[in-house]
Amino acid sequence: MKPDETPMFDPSLLKEVDWSQNTAIFSPAISPTHPGEGLVLRPLCTADLNKGFFKVLGQLTETGVVSPEQFMKSFEHMKKSGDYYVTVVEDVTLGQIVATATLIIEHKFIHSCAKRGRVEDVVVSDECRGKQLGKLLLSTLTLLSKKLNCYKITLECLPQNVGFYKKFDYTVSEENYMCRRFLK
């Protein structure tokens, strides 16, 4: 399989979020349909492998060495599950991915078999910080989780980032986030 423009999920979902429920302030005003001059907010596609997707992710954390075959296999798994909403911002003038964030839907037995949203891997490339793209991605995915009928949405962040997430009505939970790593 060769990389192409097939989206991970239906792009219309991003256009259908109820932007009137957005709680963040954008100055200048931007939105999922108008993210800024020369920018497009859309689902990840396999062609993004060659548009700097991993370069952007690498500014967040260690990505490791990922072969095109590994990327395609993971992409197809995520796409088929229907529960992964990897969203990117592309600078179409450069043909490069400049920001990304992921919404994962977790199916539960509690709350009458409800769904929980989880935000992961929010990162904006160094060159594009200050253009509100992180805010745009988080606002969009938060509203998308509501549209997808999640009973709540959660994320983990470093203490110094709590203030940023509070702008979106996220609150610090009394629960502790615990982790056990198997890979170094």
Swiss-Prot record:
Domain of life of the organism encoding this protein: Eukaryota
Record Gene3D superfamilies: 3.40.630.30
Protein name in UniProt: Glucosamine 6-phosphate N-acetyltransferase
Any one GO CC term of the record: late endosome
Residue positions binding acetyl-CoA: 130-135, 165-167
Known pathway: Nucleotide-sugar biosynthesis; UDP-N-acetyl-alpha-D-glucosamine biosynthesis; N-acetyl-alpha-D-glucosamine 1-phosphate from alpha-D-glucosamine 6-phosphate (route I): step 1/2
UniProt-listed Enzyme Commission number(s): 2.3.1.4
Assembly behavior: Homodimer.
Enzyme class: transferase
Cell compartments where the protein resides: Golgi apparatus membrane; Endosome membrane
Family the entry assigns: Belongs to the acetyltransferase family. GNA1 subfamily.
InterPro entries linked: Acyl_CoA_acyltransferase (IPR016181), GNAT_dom (IPR000182), GNPNAT1-like (IPR039143)
Single Gene Ontology BP annotation: cellular response to leukemia inhibitory factor
Predominant place of localization: Golgi
SUPFAM superfamilies, alphabetized: Acyl-CoA N-acyltransferases (Nat)
Topological relation to the membrane, as annotated: Peripheral membrane protein
Keyword Isomerase in annotation: no
GO molecular function, one term: identical protein binding
Lineage, opening ranks: Eukaryota, Metazoa, Chordata, Craniata, Vertebrata
UniProt keyword annotations, A-Z: Acyltransferase, Endosome, Golgi apparatus, Membrane, Transferase
Domain (N-acetyltransferase) ranges: 39-184
Catalysis: reaction(s): D-glucosamine 6-phosphate + acetyl-CoA = N-acetyl-D-glucosamine 6-phosphate + CoA + H(+)
Residues annotated as binding substrate: 61, 108-111, 120-122, 151-152, 175, 181
